C-alpha cells in the first residue's frame, strides 16, 4: 500500500480587498471524492497542513445546492465525518516527500489565504515536480503554485499547461468583485499556460506529472488521472 499526501489549508477565512474576512476553508467534495478514489484503490492517506492545524471546512460546501439536493448533502457530510485523517493532520513542515507516492491538494478558498504564500508548500511543490512525483491540484488549490518560487526568482510552474478556478466561475460565485486577486490572473502572471474550460464542468489538464482540475466537478477526474500515474 502506497501513501498519498493530502496538503490542505489551515485557513478558515479569505481576506477580501476591503479587509473583510470571508469565512472559508476546504471544499468538502474536493477532499471526499479523491479520498474515496485513492482509498478504494488501496492507498493510505496522510493529511498535512501548515503547523498541523486541523483543516477547517467551508460549511457552504455541505449545502444541498452544491451536492445535488438534501440526500447528496447528507451523503457527503457523512463521508466527510468518516475521514479521521482530516482530524489528525501532520505538520507540513515535517513532511518528507520521499515517503509518498503522490501529492494531492484539495481546494476551497482557504488555499488563497495561506498556501498561496506558504514557502514550505512551495518547496514541496518544486521538489514534487523535480522528482516526477504525481501531483494533483484542484479548484482554488492551484493558488499554492504561486509560492513555488525557484532560486532564480522564477516560478517552477512557468510553461506548464494547467487549470484552476476561472475568473468566470469566481464572478458567478459572487466574489470576483470583492477579491484582492483572482486565481486565473495570477496563474497567467507566473507564466503558466492556463487552460479555461466551461464554468462548473469537469476540466482536467495533464502536463508531465502535474494533474490540475478547474472546479469541484473536476476533483474525481483528477484523482482518476493521478491513479494512472501512481505505481
Can you name each region flagged by the protein language model?
Residues 135-136:
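Conserved, well-structured core segments that form or line functional sites
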Amino acid at each position: 500500500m502506497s501513501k498519498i499526501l493530502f496538503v490542505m489549508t489551515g485557513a478558515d477565512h479569505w481576506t477580501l480587498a476591503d479587509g473583510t474576512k470571508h469565512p472559508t476553508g476546504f471544499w468538502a467534495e474536493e477532499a471526499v471524492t479523491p479520498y474515496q478514489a485513492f482509498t478504494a484503490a488501496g492507498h493510505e492517506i496522510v493529511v498535512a497542513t501548515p503547523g498541523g492545524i486541523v483543516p477547517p471546512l467551508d460549511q457552504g460546501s455541505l449545502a444541498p445546492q452544491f451536492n445535488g439536493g438534501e440526500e447528496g448533502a447528507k451523503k457527503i457530510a457523512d463521508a466527510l465525518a468518516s475521514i479521521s485523517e482530516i482530524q489528525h493532520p501532520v505538520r507540513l513542515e515535517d513532511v518528507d516527500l520521499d515517503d509518498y507516492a503522490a501529492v494531492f491538494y484539495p481546494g476551497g478558498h482557504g488555499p488563497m489565504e495561506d498556501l498561496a504564500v506558504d514557502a514550505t508548500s512551495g518547496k514541496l511543490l518544486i521538489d514534487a515536480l523535480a522528482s516526477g512525483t504525481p501531483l494533483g491540484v484542484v479548484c482554488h488549490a492551484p493558488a499554492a503554485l504561486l509560492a513555488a518560487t525557484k532560486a532564480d526568482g522564477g516560478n517552477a510552474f512557468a510553461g506548464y499547461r494547467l487549470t484552476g478556478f476561472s475568473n468566470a466561475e469566481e464572478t458567478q460565485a459572487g466574489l470576483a468583485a470583492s477579491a484582492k486577486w483572482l486565481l486565473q490572473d495570477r496563474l497567467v502572471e507566473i507564466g503558466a499556460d492556463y487552460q479555461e474550460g466551461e464554468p462548473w464542468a469537469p476540466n482536467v489538464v495533464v502536463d508531465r506529472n502535474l494533474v490540475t482540475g478547474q472546479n469541484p466537478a473536476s476533483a474525481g477526474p483528477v484523482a482518476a488521472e493521478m491513479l494512472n500515474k501512481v505505481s
